[in-house]
Swiss-Prot record:
Gene3D superfamilies reported in the protein's UniProt record: D-Amino Acid Oxidase, subunit A, domain 2, FAD/NAD(P)-binding domain
Cofactor needs: FAD
SUPFAM superfamilies the record matches: FAD-linked reductases, C-terminal domain (SSF54373), FAD/NAD(P)-binding domain (SSF51905)
Protein name from the UniProt record: D-amino acid dehydrogenase 2
UniProt EC number: 1.4.99.-
Organism: Pseudomonas putida (strain ATCC 47054 / DSM 6125 / CFBP 8728 / NCIMB 11950 / KT2440)
PANTHER family (UniProt xref): D-AMINO ACID DEHYDROGENASE, SARCOSINE DEHYDROGENASE-RELATED
UniProt record, GO biological process: D-alanine catabolic process
Functional summary from the UniProt entry: Oxidative deamination of D-amino acids.
Keywords assigned: FAD, Flavoprotein, Oxidoreductase
Family: Belongs to the DadA oxidoreductase family.
Gene label: dadA2
Catalytic reactions of this protein: a D-alpha-amino acid + A + H2O = a 2-oxocarboxylate + AH2 + NH4(+)
Pathways per UniProt: Amino-acid degradation; D-alanine degradation; NH(3) and pyruvate from D-alanine: step 1/1
């Protein structure tokens, strides 16, 4: 059975790999010249199931208003006039209740924990190396109010059986020695010892190499134009003016997925959250982080690779704008100077931005659609790296009609009450603009 995977980020590549392991004939198509060239290229590098939480949370609407007035705020909104932007924000606001937050977080943690287990198994089986570390994540609190507010997240961690450790200032210096000199600006921390780190682009590149050995074909530099369909089946995909056919189709196009799906009558509430990162060469290993640090105040992650520090964060709701905002670089540099002033050379840092495909409830869209041979793997937001292996393996099991190792409840697009709004006769979805 032939499967055509659209998109070669970490999600599409993981989908292809796990499909090939189940014996499918897999072809991956992407407009870029190699895998992991867009959202997966320079993300924060953290694999943090315990911190899998939706942005839509109680109190966020009021925080968002406050953040809009701050220079170094973690969230910014630039209204584009796009109706989809307004609808997405309205849906997000509806998910900012305690009950919805609990449901959404459970789904995210369920998939994230499974994904971490899949990654551990993959690493044990193959020895894949991607500058990975398994030394946990430490969430830094600069105020006592932040420490107190963490009680709600700790309750969810306990319910999910996720190990954690509350740290005072001395405890912070114990797990992250380079912070000893600045511990007085901190009020405490929450550490998740089972979290991991690694270079997502490097991982995706090596996973693609392993997929090639399993027979997966990668076709780069090709324009995915539109889906051709009739009734409840996809007939093929128009790629560079030619109709490509397969038995099953997987859409893993990140923020661009809705543009392909809308003409089919599928409303996928996935919207780009623009994020930024700095990659800083390490000049003093003893003054650099040991693993991943999360700065709760600025919602920024600082991750240690072999000889580099990756600093990533922020969310701009600004459509598909990929311009680099110098103010965001200023914020990232400020945080590095706050916490690791002697760790790396900021003058040699590379500045990057990418579009995270986010759903309004935080949970990705993984699973079947109203079309019998079309499957989705998109909408992972800031957790694409954390959820990649689990999402790919889960989807491969669903396509193979095998019982997944975790419940897939609440993960597919049916949770949004989607119904097709197209005619029954054959149509083609028009080309999506990228």
């Amino acid at each position: 059975m032939r499967v055509l995977v659209l998109g070669s980020g970490v999600i599409g590549t993981a989908s292809a790999y796990y499909l090939a392991r189940q014996g499918f004939e897999v072809t991956v198509v992407d407009r870029q010249p190699a895998v992991a060239m867009e959202t997966s290229f320079a993300n924060a590098g953290q694999i943090s199931p315990g911190y899998a939480s939706p942005w839509a949370a109680p109190g966020v609407p009021l925080k968002a208003i406050k953040w809009l007035l701050e220079r170094h705020a973690p969230l910014a909104i630039k209204l584009t006039g796009d109706v989809d932007q307004y609808l997405w924000m309205a849906q997000m606001l509806r998910n900012c209740t305690a009950s919805r937050y609990a449901v959404n977080k459970e789904r995210m943690v369920r998939l994230s924990e499974y994904s971490r287990d899949c990654l551990d198994e993959l690493r044990a089986e193959t020895g894949i190396n991607y500058e990975n570390r398994s030394l946990g994540t430490t969430q830094l609190f600069r105020t006592q109010a932040q420490v107190d507010a963490a009680a709600k997240d700790i309750a969810v961690l306990e319910q999910s059986g996720v190990p954690y450790e509350l740290l005072d200032r001395d405890g912070i210096a114990r797990v992250e020695p380079a912070l000893a000199g600045v511990k007085d600006i901190l009020a405490g921390a929450l550490r998740l010892p089972n979290d991991q780190t690694g270079d997502c682009q490097l991982f995706t590149t090596k996973l693609a190499d392993m997929a090639l050995k399993l027979g997966v074909e990668f076709r780069f530099g090709q324009d995915i134009q539109r889906l051709d369909f009739a009734g409840d089946r996809i007939n093929g995909v128009w790629i560079d003016g030619k109709l490509e056919t397969a038995d099953r189709y997987v859409l893993a196009l990140g923020s661009y997925s809705p543009q392909m799906l809308k003409p089919l009558g599928i409303k996928a509430p996935v919207y780009p959250l623009k994020g930024y990162s700095l990659t800083v060469p390490i000049t003093n290993s003893d003054m650099a982080p040991t693993s991943t640090i999360l700065d709760e105040t600025y919602k920024v992650a600082i991750t240690r690779f072999d000889n580099r520090i990756r600093v990533g964060g922020m969310a701009e709701i600004a459509g598909f704008d990929l311009s680099l905002n110098p103010r965001r670089r200023e914020t990232l540099e400020m945080i590095v100077n706050d916490l690791y002033p002697r760790g790396g050379d900021l003058s040699q840092a590379s500045f990057w931005t990418g579009l995270r495909p986010a759903t309004p409830d935080g949970t990705p869209i993984v699973g079947a659609t109203a079309f019998r041979n079309l499957f989705l793997n998109t909408g992972h937001g800031t957790l694409g790296w954390t959820m990649a292996c689990g999402s790919g393996r889960l989807l491969a099991d669903l396509i193979a009609r095998k019982k997944p190792q975790i419940s897939a409840e609440g993960l597919d697009i049916s949770r949004y009450g989607n119904s097709r709004e197209v005619a029954k006769h054959g149509q083609s979805a028009p080309a999506h603009q990228q």
